[in-house]
């Protein structure tokens, strides 16, 4: 079943709102315009932190649906755990939902079910292969973000590759998990160095996947023998008297 931990969700929102984590929130907000350049569509589904929802809203959308918590419903069949029809959304945005969802791969499969043939899927989350992932075992597991599920870029790419998606955008930021006030003035310089020497090892990842469309190619029939059209025998012709 698709379930989220309500406590983890709320604590992550509080974490982003803390003044000490301003730089991480800014990193995410700065990435949103870059992500939006790679997505376009009419029917958008937003799954994740409500803190960043309005950044993805647009008057061009015919529909915009946002959900934060994911739970199973008695009215939803076992094969359809999100209350949406197949092929119903062409833009899907996932902000940290993989991090606080108990079964992230099941969520990915559900996203694929409701995605149209030309859909784009955007994801933001915590990168397992980073300094954040390295220090996570040493941190307090009862506070955010250390009690969340971190995922590697490789695993996420493989999940979507198996389902038939191509990666159209990839980036990471927030190289250092803890930023003392004495270092805050150097954050921009550290970010530049991280882009050059450790582009895949930032604590936050930003990914966009496009669903592959497999066009139907018409096949020309080749006849090995000549196709003969025989005339009707005269006796079979209807004569008007």
Kindly label every feature range from the protein language model:
Residues 105-120:
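A short glycine-rich, Lys/Arg-flanked "PGG" loop and its adjoining helix->strand segment in the class I
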Residues 167-192, 200-202:
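Conserved catalytic loop of SAM-dependent methyltransferase domains
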Residues 190-241:
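C-terminal lobe and adjacent flexible extensions of AdoMet/dcAdoMet transferase-like proteins
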Residues 80-92:
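A short acidic, Gly/Pro-enriched loop at the edge of an enzyme's catalytic core
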Residues 30, 34-82:
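Class I SAM-dependent methyltransferase SAM/SAH-binding core
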Residues 120-147:
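Conserved class I S-adenosyl-L-methionine
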Residues 147-170:
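Short alpha-helix
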Residues 1-37:
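Class I SAM-dependent methyltransferase Rossmann-like catalytic core
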């Amino acid at each position: 079943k698709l379930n989220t931990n309500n406590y983890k969700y709320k604590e992550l929102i509080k974490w982003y709102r803390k003044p000490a984590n301003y730089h991480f929130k800014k990193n995410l907000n700065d990435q949103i315009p870059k992500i939006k350049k790679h997505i376009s569509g009419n029917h958008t589904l937003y799954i994740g932190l409500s803190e960043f929802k309005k950044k993805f809203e647009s008057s061009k959308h015919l529909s915009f649906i946002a959900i934060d918590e994911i739970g199973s419903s008695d009215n939803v069949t076992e094969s359809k755990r999100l209350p949406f029809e197949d092929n119903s959304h062409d833009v899907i945005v996932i902000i940290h939902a993989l991090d606080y969802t108990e079964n992230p791969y099941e969520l990915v499969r559900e996203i694929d079910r409701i995605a149209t043939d030309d859909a784009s899927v955007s994801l933001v989350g915590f990168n397992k292969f980073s300094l954040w992932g390295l220090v996570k075992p040493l941190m307090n597991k009862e506070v955010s973000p250390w009690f969340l599920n971190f995922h590697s870029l490789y695993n996420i790419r493989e999940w979507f590759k198996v389902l038939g998606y191509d990666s159209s955008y990839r980036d990471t930021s927030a190289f250092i998990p803890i930023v003392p006030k004495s270092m805050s003035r150097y954050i921009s310089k550290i970010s530049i160095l991280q882009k050059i020497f450790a582009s895949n090892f930032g604590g936050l990842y930003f990914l966009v996947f496009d669903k592959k469309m497999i066009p139907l190619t018409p096949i020309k029939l080749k006849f090995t023998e000549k196709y003969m059209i025989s005339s009707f025998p005269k006796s079979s012709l209807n004569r008007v008297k």
